[in-house]
Amino acid sequence: MNVALIDPTARVADGAWLADDVEVGPYCIVGPDVTLEDGVRLHAHVNVQGVTTLGARTQVYPFASLGTPPQSVHYKGEKTSLVVGTDCQIREHVTMNTGTASGRGVTRVGNNCMLMTAAHVAHDCLVGDNVIFANNATLGGHVEVGDNVFLGGLSAVHQFVRIGAQVMIGGVTGVREDVIPFGYAIGQNANLVGLNVVGMKRRGFSKSELHAARAAYRDLFFGEGTFAERLAGLRERQDASPFIKALVSFVDAGGKRALCHPSRGVVAQED
């Protein structure tokens, strides 16, 4: 631990492990079970507690509070953890809780994530890589978020919901059901309004791949027969498209929540 990089007003408990080039700014508090890897910077007034690991080059801004106990009535003081990946930007007033013994025991946030002001990650969440939380975006307990997801400002995700990779959640959206990979969901009670086409283009999807994805979306949600029959039809075609394969795998995996659908009366998204 390089003492020269710790502001004299900061408090770093005995037992904390800090890499040599970590910077701990004014009035930060670091608990005894915290690990700060290479290049981590706590700017000022940051609180890091619990069994918490912050990955290399992650930066944490003033008044963020990480690794505090889960907000669960079932928590009885068990030693659970928080793991944050590399190269994350954790902005002002962000909160992240550790896991619960009755859940995963750990809350995980992936690499290269940005959590804007006052975002919240609750106990036992699993967040993938390259995820962006806009201001005040909130995850309830046990939520799973795939890679490259964008959560709009003031959005709220109900506990145990799964959000697939590449999803866009609109601002001020309440998500109570699982959202398919590449989906775009908005509304006070979120409904699908199509695919996250802008995100797919940014990820290099070709015109033919976008056409196939839109066709599969229409077939699943607007086709003939029951939902189970339409899903079975896609299952037979899943080797033809990475999108279809990801879609079928997500639905087949299931979860504790229902699947988010388009609202009634919505017209299928056209090419």
Swiss-Prot record:
EC number: 2.3.1.129
A GO cellular component entry from the record: membrane
Classification via CDD domains: LbH_UDP-GlcNAc_AT
Keywords (A to Z) from UniProt: Acyltransferase, Cytoplasm, Lipid A biosynthesis, Lipid biosynthesis, Lipid metabolism, Repeat, Transferase
Predominant cellular place of this UniProt entry's protein: cytoplasm
Keyword Acyltransferase: yes
GO function term, MF aspect, one: acyl-[acyl-carrier-protein]-UDP-N-acetylglucosamine O-acyltransferase activity
A Pfam family matched in the record: Hexapep
Record GO biological process: lipid A biosynthetic process
UniProt family annotation: Belongs to the transferase hexapeptide repeat family. LpxA subfamily.
Purpose: Involved in the biosynthesis of lipid A, a phosphorylated glycolipid that anchors the lipopolysaccharide to the outer membrane of the cell.
Listed name of the protein: Acyl-[acyl-carrier-protein]--UDP-N-acetylglucosamine O-acyltransferase
Gene: lpxA
